[in-house]
Amino acid sequence: ILTHTCRFGDELEYGKKIFHSIKSDNLLSEFVSDNLQLISTTTRENSSFMGRMTQWLLNGKFESATGKDLSIDTDRVMICGSLEMLKEHKEICLQKGMMEGSNSAPGHFVIEKAFVD
């Protein structure tokens, strides 16, 4: 499941481009089949899917939208975004029993800090 949250709808194009390129790639599309989902939300512009993904994970909207909850048995999470969002997502993952990973010790989630502002 690829989630992408931005302030405004036109900022969501990057996530849509990644999603559609995976779905149209001959090798990757066979691997992901119908399992790949895209959940795009906005935080400032009114849209059919509004709110921060951290809120969605905590209030059940993520599970309602995807039919799944995060599982340490089947899921791996890569988190990228603002410093505050990274902290919030990390705490949610830890509460679900997930362990942070690194290059030398794979875990259930990793944090990408290259884009922290």
Q: In which residue ranges do the predicted regions lie?
A:
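Reductase modules of NAD(P)H-dependent flavoproteins
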Residues: T3, D10-D117
